[in-house]
């Protein structure tokens, strides 16, 4: 039985992971759950899964949860704050940690789990793209393992040789007869929109993905295709891939989740209906597979599968992320922080959709940071850039 801690249990990934655990109680046991401040969902999760521990980042929410658990006579211990969250990520009794906290808030807890030698089921891409060198170095020295949850990286993982699966980031693609990886992306809800149309889209429109049910932040990132740029960076680190070894392809139907081109001419792909439970369940059960309630792919109902090259003019955030990766970890940290503030401001209706790119570009172009020498340097860059980005948003409002 695998003993699980979920970082970000009240979000989309966490809720879906718990639904898989609920269907497979003989395979998984929940040891600890972590969330930000959604105490009502956390209360329900405690009632259903009886974790030994939970941690809420928000102290007020933790206080409310303690009262409600006591009233319900549930013995789960409630902790609060980042220090306690990191402690739960490294619990001795846990062997698998699902890293699903959104954004840079997931960095330190994920690193804590890595240093403790856990198997990390990674959905929090921000922790890897901003601190890839330190992340992979810690992974190597601790003996921890990493399995990606993102549908694209999970799809690639599924069709890789076992040698790479067991040693992500430690071996080259070329040594395993791989010519390149193909990251697919739907193009989001706006891939047919004109530039003038994009300036008027609403947060609700941006969060209405045609194929996937996701959280708000990642939905907006999908709409700008920043998400694909971040996934490009994630793939570079995870699979130790060179720039020439990654291709990006727009695939609006979201049936082929990614592909691996081998030197012998074989192109291996992972196909399924667009349901994140497929990749979550594979990550949780690897190297085995388990039954899920995901519908099977029916080829008779698929009219056609289409593919396009990405248009960097229409999706400049994608190009911005690819270029930032080539500039180093400081640039990726700057871009990630600026984007988190810009997306949050758009969701709060403070800025227009097209301003997301403008803010990202201006902050990235105007920032000049030395390459980080440690995690603390990355956190400091992140802190300073968030201030710059918030000031930029304020200047656009007033």
Curated annotation (Swiss-Prot):
Mn(2+) binds at residues 150, 152, 231. It comes from the Bacteria. Pathway: Isoprenoid biosynthesis; isopentenyl diphosphate biosynthesis via DXP pathway; isopentenyl diphosphate from 1-deoxy-D-xylulose 5-phosphate: step 1/6. 1-deoxy-D-xylulose 5-phosphate binds at residues 125, 151-152, 186, 209, 222, 227-228, 231. NADPH binds at residues 10-13, 37-38, 124, 126, 215. Keywords: Isoprene biosynthesis, Manganese, Metal-binding, NADP, Oxidoreductase. Homodimer. Belongs to the DXR family. PANTHER family: 1-DEOXY-D-XYLULOSE 5-PHOSPHATE REDUCTOISOMERASE, 1-DEOXY-D-XYLULOSE 5-PHOSPHATE REDUCTOISOMERASE, CHLOROPLASTIC. Catalyzes the NADPH-dependent rearrangement and reduction of 1-deoxy-D-xylulose-5-phosphate (DXP) to 2-C-methyl-D-erythritol 4-phosphate (MEP). This is 1-deoxy-D-xylulose 5-phosphate reductoisomerase. It comes from Buchnera aphidicola subsp. Acyrthosiphon pisum (strain APS) (Acyrthosiphon pisum symbiotic bacterium). The lineage of its organism: Bacteria, Pseudomonadati, Pseudomonadota, Gammaproteobacteria, Enterobacterales.
